[in-house]
C-alpha cells in the first residue's frame, strides 16, 4: 500500500510496515543494510521482524536519546572523513560556508554539476541562463560568455569548499562535429525558444562537454561522467516538487562511441582532465571498464 511508503501514514506506521515486509527481502541490499545499521549503531544482532518491531523501536529510540545520535554522530562514529554533495553552478553554497565555520570532523565538499546548461532543448533553458548570469555577475549573450560564467562559478565552488570534482550527468550522448559559429547559432536559437533538431542538440552537447572538460583540466578538476540517467521518469511528481528530487532512474543506454570520441578529441589536443566514468546500469560496467 503506497500509503505506507510515500503516503500520509505516520513515520511510526511506515516503520511497522517496513518491519513486516523486511523478512521477505533476503537477498536485497536493504535487508543487509538494515542488519548492518542495527548492529553498528545499536549493537542489536536480531533480524528486524513484525514480532520484535516494537521492542527494537523502543530500544533504538532510547539509545538515540542517551547517545545524542545525530546525523553527525553517525558520520563520525562511522569514520566518514569526506562527504560530497552536488550542487548547481548557481547555488550560493551558504550551508557549505556554515559547515566550514563549524570545523566538523567530516569534511564536506560539493561536486560541480552544470547539467542544466547542457540541456539546451529544455523549456527553461533561457530562464536558467538568466539565473546563471546573476550568480556569475556577468551578462550571458553567447555560448562563449556562458562558458566564462560557468568557469567563474567553478572557481567559486573551489574557493568555498576546496572541491576539485565535477558531476556531469549524461542521459545519452552522440558526438557530432561542429564549428564555433554553428554552436553560437544553436545557443541563440535555444535561448530564444526555437525548436532544435536532434543533430543540433548533439552538436551543442558535444561542444559543451568538450569545452567544460578543458575548463576542468586547466582548473585541476576531475571530470566525473555518470552515464545512462533516465531523467524525470515520473513527470507528475516532477511538476509538483521539481527536478532532481528523486524521480530519475537508470537507463540501459550505453553511448560508448560518443563518449569515446569526446575523450579521444581531448587527448589529441592534450587537454583531457583526470576522468571518472561510471554507468548507472550495473550490467554495463564491463563495457565501460574495458
Which residues does each predicted region cover?
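Histidine-centered catalytic micro-motifs
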Residues: 1, 222-231
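Short hydrophobic/aromatic-rich motifs at helix boundaries and adjacent loops
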Residues: 65-69, 232, 259-263
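Metal-cofactor-binding active-site regions of metalloenzymes
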Residues: 1-219, 271-290
Amino acid at each position: 500500500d503506497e500509503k505506507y511508503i510515500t503516503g500520509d501514514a505516520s513515520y511510526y506506521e511506515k516503520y511497522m510496515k517496513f518491519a513486516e515486509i523486511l523478512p521477505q527481502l533476503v537477498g536485497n541490499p536493504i535487508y543487509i543494510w538494515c542488519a548492518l545499521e542495527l548492529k553498528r549503531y545499536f549493537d542489536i544482532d536480531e533480524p528486524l521482524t513484525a514480532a520484535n518491531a516494537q521492542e527494537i523501536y523502543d530500544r533504538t529510540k532510547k539509545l538515540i536519546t542517551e547517545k545524542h545520535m545525530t546525523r553527525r554522530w553517525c558520520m563520525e562514529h562511522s569514520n566518514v572523513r569526506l562527504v560530497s554533495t552536488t550542487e548547481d553552478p548557481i547555488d550560493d553554497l551558504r550551508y557549505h560556508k556554515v559547515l566550514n565555520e563549524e570545523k566538523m570532523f567530516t569534511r564536506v565538499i560539493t561536486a560541480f554539476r552544470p547539467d542544466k546548461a547542457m540541456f539546451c532543448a529544455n523549456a527553461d533553458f533561457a530562464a536558467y541562463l538568466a539565473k546563471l548570469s546573476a550568480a556569475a555577475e556577468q551578462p550571458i549573450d553567447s555560448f562563449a560568455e556562458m562558458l566564462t560564467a560557468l568557469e567563474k562559478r567553478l572557481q567559486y565552488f573551489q574557493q568555498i569548499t576546496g572541491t576539485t570534482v565535477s558531476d556531469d550527468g549524461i542521459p545519452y550522448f552522440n558526438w557530432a562535429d561542429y564549428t564555433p559559429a554553428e554552436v553560437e547559432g544553436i545557443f541563440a536559437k535555444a535561448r530564444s525558444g526555437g525548436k532544435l533538431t536532434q543533430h543540433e542538440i548533439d552538436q551543442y552537447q558535444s561542444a559543451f562537454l568538450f569545452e567544460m572538460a578543458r575548463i576542468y583540466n586547466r582548473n585541476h578538476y576531475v571530470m566525473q561522467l555518470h552515464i545512462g540517467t533516465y531523467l524525470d521518469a515520473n513527470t507528475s511528481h516532477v511538476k509538483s516538487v521539481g527536478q532532481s528530487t528523486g524521480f530519475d532512474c537508470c537507463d540501459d543506454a550505453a553511448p560508448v562511441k560518443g563518449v569515446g570520441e569526446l575523450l579521444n578529441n581531448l587527448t589529441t589536443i592534450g587537454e583531457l582532465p583526470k576522468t571518472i566514468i561510471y554507468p548507472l546500469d550495473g550490467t554495463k560496467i564491463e563495457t565501460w571498464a574495458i
